[in-house]
Structure formats: C-alpha cells, structure tokens
Amino acid sequence: MKEKTPTPMKNIRNFSIIAHIDHGKSTLADCLIAECNAISNREMKSQVMDTMDIEKERGITIKAQSVRLNYTFKGEDYVLNLIDTPGHVDFSYEVSRSLCSCEGALLVVDATQGVEAQTIANTYIALDNNLEILPVINKIDLPNANVLEVKQDIEDTIGIDWFNANEVSAKAKLGIKDLLEKIITTIPAPSGDPNNPLKALIYDSWFDNYLGALALVRIMDGSINTEQEILVMGTGKKHGVLGLYYPNPLKKIPTKSLECGEIGIVSLGLKSVTDIAVGDTLTDAENPTSKPIEGFMPAKPFVFAGLYPIETDRFEDLREALLKLQLNDCALNFEPESSVALGFGFRVGFLGLLHMEVIKERLEREFSLNLIATAPTVVYEVHLTDNSIKYVQNPSELPPENHIACIKEPFVRATIITPSEFLGNLMQLLNNKRGIQEKMEYLNQSRVMLTYSLPSNEIVMDFYDKLKSCTKGYASFDYEPIENREANLVKLDVRVAGDVVDALSIIIDKNKAYEKGRALVETMKELIPRQLFEVAIQASVGNKIIARETIKSVGKNVTAKCYGGDITRKRKLLEKQKEGKKRMKAIGKVELPQEAFLAILKID
C-alpha cells in the first residue's frame, strides 16, 4: 500500500453546516458528499449523515457527524472536513462543540422561511468562535421561494453581508459546485504549528462495540501517529494509539497519522468514554504541550424527570440501558431514586424536552422497556433559614415551608420570531407563562422578533406545543439560560385516598396553585377507575387542602336477596356493607393509570 502524502495545511478546510431545524441541512450535506464522491452511488442514501433510526423517522439531526471530503480545484487537491450539526434548540451543545473545531460555517437559510430563531442563536455561537460565515440560501427552486427578501433578512437580522450568499437547491442539486469552490476560496485554512508538541481537542466521543471508546479530535498543533504514546491531560493517564481513522458516516478510513489542522478518530483501547471526556486535550506523553486547550463548554442538563420501569423487576435492565446510552451521550446523566407510588427508578437529566422524548423512545424501542416518566422539572436554588443552600431537582426533596427563607428558580432568555398577525396571541401566552418583555423588533412588515426572560419551569412543560398552536406553527423559538431569580413558589401535592402520591408533586408559582390544583383533581377524577370504596382526590399546599374531588364507589345491591318488606333486615345489610367499605378504604390501594402521571403535562 502506497504511503499517503500529508495534505498541506493551506489545502485543508474545516467547516460546519448550521441551520434551523427543517431548513435542508442534512440534504445539503448529502449533496456535498455525493459531489465529492466520498460515498459510492451504490451506498449513497438520503440523510446519510443521520445514522440513528429515530433521526431518519423524525427528520432531525441529533448527533453531530463528520466526514472527510476530497475535492480538486484549479489543479490542486483539497481536503474538506464537513461537520453536520443538529438544528433543534435541545442539541445546541452539539453545535457549539462542533464549531470549536472549525474555521468556517455554512449558514443555511430556507428561501421560503427566512431567518429563524435557532439560525440566529447558532450564528452567534459561530461568531463567538471567530468563524468565517458563508450564507447559503437553500430551496431556491420552490415556487414560493423569495430569495431577495431572505437576503435582506440575513443582513437586517444577523448583520452579515448578503452579497456573498450562495443560492442553492440541495434537492435539485443546483449550485453545489459553486458552493464547494466558495468554501475553498472563502473559508480560511487552519492555523497551528506542525512543529510544536501535539495538542488535539476532543470534540466528540462515542463507544464502538469492537474498538471501545473512540475520540473525534481536531489536531491544533503537532501531529499524531500509530507509534506514539498519548497523554490524556484531564485524567493524567497514558495510552498507546491502537488506531487512527478519517471520519466517514458508513465506514472509518484507517490512516497511519493525523497531521496539524486535520480532523480524525483516535482509538486508545479504552473501555469508557469518561476516560476521554469531550473538551479534554490529547498530547504526546514524551513531549507534552505546556497547557490544555481552554474555553470548551461542557453540556449541562436543563430538565430533570423520573423514569420508572412499569415492571418493577426491570430496574437493573433500565440501569444497564441508561449506561449504554450514556456511552454516546455525554449530556445524559442519571442517579437512582425511589418513589412510594412508582417504586425504584432513576432521576435523569436531559438537555430539553425533545432530548427527553428521544431518550425515552430509544429506551423503549432499543431495550424493550415499558416506562413511566414523571413531569419534567428544573433545578431550584433553595435558601434555608440556617443560611445553607440546597439544590432541588425533585419536588419531593423540597424542605418544609418553615425551613425555607426563599426559593430561586432558573430563568432563560427566549428569542421568538413570529408573523406579526399572531403577535397578540403570542404575547398573551408569554404573559401567562410569567414572561418579562425585554425587546420587540420588527424584522420587516410581516415578521416580529420578541426577546423575553422566562422562568425555565414554564417552558419545560408544554410551552413549545402552545407556541406552535397559537401561531399556527409559524413561530420559531430559541433560548439560553441566564440566571436564578427569586420567586414565590410552593409545592403542590396530590393526595389519592389520603396518601400523597410523590410522583405527582410539582413546584409551582403560588398564584397559579389553586387553578392548577383544581384542574388536576378534576382530570384525575376522569382518569382513575371507580373502586369498591369511595376515593377522595385532593390537591394540597403544605397542610392546606385547596381542591377536592370524590370518585363514588361502585355500588353493589346487597339487599337483592331480601324478599318481603322487613326494613330492619335491609338496614342491617346496608350498615354491614358500609362497615366493610370503611375497612376497605383504610387498607385499599388505588392503582393509578399511566395517564394520571401525564395529566400534569396537559394542564395549563
């Protein structure tokens, strides 16, 4: 096999594709791969960069993928390293870490939709990383495409000169060659010193069944080869290099070395991705670099929920399944917890509601588990009367009211872009969700950008669905965490037959407690089947009952066999039945259907 000659750094381009969800990012990636013949026509399929079934079904990108492309321009061979990124707000950490390894980004905007909230958010991440941004207007072949207006939109909203914008149609394969040439002429080559000691940033890691934990790295300085011993700076441990590869969605391409400026996969024979944490630095064990790469933001969970197996004996199976998913998802964390109502399960941290849905669906589909998920919550900062601070992510952990000095809840800054005709409905929704308006800006005659600060708790329940319904699906939404603010919060408990069902407890704004409690008990009354005894459903704050509904018992005619008119005999039987029901009520357990736990999500 002929030894490959290293690609000169001046001929390497590392770039990402950033876009709002559904703007045709994965289709554009497919076109660039096909144009560069990185995958044969026989193996090429749509959304080749989306490798999970769930990504293909939902039409979304969850896991950032990379591919090495070779392209010849003006007689010179170039290497283009393409990193596809997710578009949904929950997976913006995947975007930020992918952009750390690039010099440029294609900003894809749908010619029929214009700039949307997530486009703006990802652009700011790219600008913070000093990336060269190349605007790309996609779907120009559609009859309702409005290219001129979108160009103006890009300039007015983001402040990027639209003059350089490339017009393409990924579906119809228009403008792809021009775009590849623009990438080469516009995006700068990587900087770095090939003669310095090795410094490589781990910007992704995952678990391979055959090779163990793999690190996707960008070589910032120096180079790496298969003969080297490597030091992982975060752990201080040394490992031999078992293999080096170029990334490709279908198969890893082996190589003997990775040079300065390149992107590649490193196999060190490790059993867990925790040994090669994302954001860590690899260096040469013999001649290490003086300090690791800084400024990398790790993913932090934003939403927490309890996951419990319906078959209680499958607790260990759930643990195994979560551990397997965690191998490829550094943002997923979990710890065991128990609930009086649901038994043993796990408190799981997610990036957002979509991330939670995806994880729950994968656990049920890939590991054949039947799960109950409790209502999602955020982390509250609870200041106690003894001047200590407790962080609470499970409502059942909230200390008694007389021990609490104040509670602070996390806030986010939300950016929403909406057609102006829905502005009234949207502002009403934001006010209902305790939003505080910071800015309102008309992008053009028909579109408005709103900036609000909102309690995180208000957006983790049903905000996204309500936003879509009050704007007929036209509004786009993005958020970033800002700070914790003091709030007037209480714990709302639900009691069924006198017992608090801990899995149904929620932390809520005090002014909304009565309304939510009333709606909750009314819904529960419809969902819980009638028992042989009377069941009281109560909503309480502290020891105070604020709402109550009663499920009447199923009647049994105990006097049916009493013929004749002896009223005392009938009365005796009815009294006996009443005594029996009283005893049953004291010891009877009420089975709650799964819908009861989901009821909290559905109630505004």
Curated annotation (Swiss-Prot):
Gene3D superfamilies on file: 3.30.70.240, Elongation factor 4, C-terminal domain, Elongation Factor G (Translational Gtpase), domain 3, P-loop containing nucleotide triphosphate hydrolases, Translation factors
A Pfam family of this chain: EFG_C
Keywords: Cell inner membrane, Cell membrane, GTP-binding, Hydrolase, Membrane, Nucleotide-binding, Protein biosynthesis
GO cellular component, one term: plasma membrane
Broad enzyme group: hydrolase
GO terms assigned for molecular function: GTP binding; GTPase activity; ribosome binding; translation elongation factor activity
GO biological process terms, semicolon-separated: positive regulation of translation
Enzyme nomenclature, EC number: 3.6.5.n1
Transmembrane segments: none
Residues the entry annotates as binding GTP: 22-27, 138-141
Domain of life, per lineage: Bacteria
Localization per Swiss-Prot or TrEMBL: Cell inner membrane
Record carries keyword Nucleotide-binding: yes
Alphabetical list of InterPro entries matching this protein: EF-4, EFG_III/V, EFG_V-like, EFTu-like_2, G_TR_CS, LepA_C_sf, LepA_CTD, LepA_IV
Main location (coarse class): membrane
Keyword Nucleotide-binding (UniProt): yes
NCBIfam families: lepA, small_GTP
Primary role: Required for accurate and efficient protein synthesis under certain stress conditions. May act as a fidelity factor of the translation reaction, by catalyzing a one-codon backward translocation of tRNAs on improperly translocated ribosomes. Back-translocation proceeds from a post-translocation (POST) complex to a pre-translocation (PRE) complex, thus giving elongation factor G a second chance to translocate the tRNAs correctly. Binds to ribosomes in a GTP-dependent manner.
Name of the molecule in the record: Elongation factor 4
Species name: Helicobacter pylori (strain J99 / ATCC 700824) (Campylobacter pylori J99)
